[in-house]
A protein has these predicted regions:
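An acidic-aromatic loop/edge-strand motif
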Residues: 1-61, 88, 106-113, 120-191, ...
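Aromatic-lined ligand-binding clefts that engage carbohydrates, nucleic acids, or primary amines
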Residues: 73-98, 132, 191-216, 233-237
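Short beta-strands within extracellular/lumenal beta-sheet-rich domains
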Residues: 59-75, 115-118, 183-194, 220-225
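Solvent-exposed beta-strand/loop surfaces of large extracellular or lumenal domains
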Residues: 94-118, 206, 210-224
């Protein structure tokens, strides 16, 4: 792996002014809250936040009620470190198992500068169910989004997602089923091959692109030419971001387009269970020795 594994926190219980109000996927909760209060919805036709803030900043940021979100995740075996990633953390207060978190000391994410990454204090975590509580004074300005846990661990999806020890190896096949359902970085496979130089062609995979040494393959035929082997050939599949940033509940999982509406589907086009696409290299590459 070229980055840490990820667990997406996108389903929560929510409380308005201390009263339990429901449970569900975070973007659907955002819509439910806004509809119940007669507030404008976020979406493809919304007035952009910067415009609202510039021309109606007082009402845009006016607190309307206290909102609390409770996210649950399970730790089967304690890893050496877990970090929490949040977008616009300055708008929220965070508590892990009742212990406050200080995002003022968080680092900027290397994925997107809108994210801040905070290493959690491991003494605040327990093996078993852990609860992340997120509080805010809700206003039109507030954006409810997913939060992300990252670290050197495996992930198992379910009604409550769980963390378990990082798998020692990754085999050919769908990495979603191997403990990496939300992972979207690079995975390097070590391909056994006698010393020499090879053309390497991959015919069965799903990733953004492939690379080895300083060469990349982005279009068919997915062939990397004149790659050296010292006994193994490093072959990296750089995965897409779909299983990290969604849509994560839309049916079908693999869609040729992605618009704001795809994140808030309902009825037959929505499943509370995660709808993830298969990713990784599914079968050994074809090697042609030069």
């Amino acid at each position: 792996l070229d980055s840490e594994n990820i667990l997406v926190l996108d389903t929560a219980d929510y409380y308005i002014d201390g009263e339990y109000s429901g449970h569900g996927e975070i973007l659907h909760l955002d819509r439910d809250i806004r509809l119940s209060r007669g507030m404008p919805l976020r979406g493809g036709e919304m007035v952009q936040p910067w415009f609202k803030n510039k021309y109606n900043g007082r009402d845009f940021a006016k607190p309307l009620f206290k909102l609390a979100l409770l996210y649950r995740f399970q730790i089967d075996s304690m890893p050496n470190q877990i970090s929490l990633t949040a977008e616009s953390p300055e708008d929220f207060s965070f508590f892990i198992n009742g212990n406050p978190l200080d995002f003022s000391v968080a680092d900027e994410s290397d994925v997107d500068p809108c994210f801040k990454v905070l290493p959690l204090k491991m003494k605040d975590l327990v093996e078993g169910i852990n609860i992340l509580r997120v509080e805010c004074d809700f206003s039109d300005k507030i954006n409810l989004e997913c939060f992300y846990l990252s670290g050197n661990f495996g992930v198992r999806t379910g009604e409550v997602c769980s963390v378990f020890p990082l798998p020692e190896t990754i085999r050919f096949g769908d990495v979603v089923k191997q403990g990496f359902p939300f992972y979207s970085g690079g995975i390097t496979y070590l391909i056994p091959a006698p010393k020499g130089r090879y053309d390497v062609e991959v015919t069965d995979f799903y990733a953004e692109y492939l690379k080895s040494e300083q060469k990349i393959a982005t279009f068919a035929p997915f062939r990397l030419e004149n790659i050296p082997s010292d006994g193994t050939i490093p072959l990296t599949a750089v995965l897409t971001r779909k299983n990290t940033f969604g849509p994560l509940h839309e049916i079908p999982a693999k869609n040729k387009q992605c618009s704001p509406g795809d994140f808030i589907t309902g009825g037959e086009m929505y499943d509370s269970a995660y709808q993830l696409i298969e990713q990784g290299i599914f079968s050994p590459p074809v090697l042609k020795k030069l």
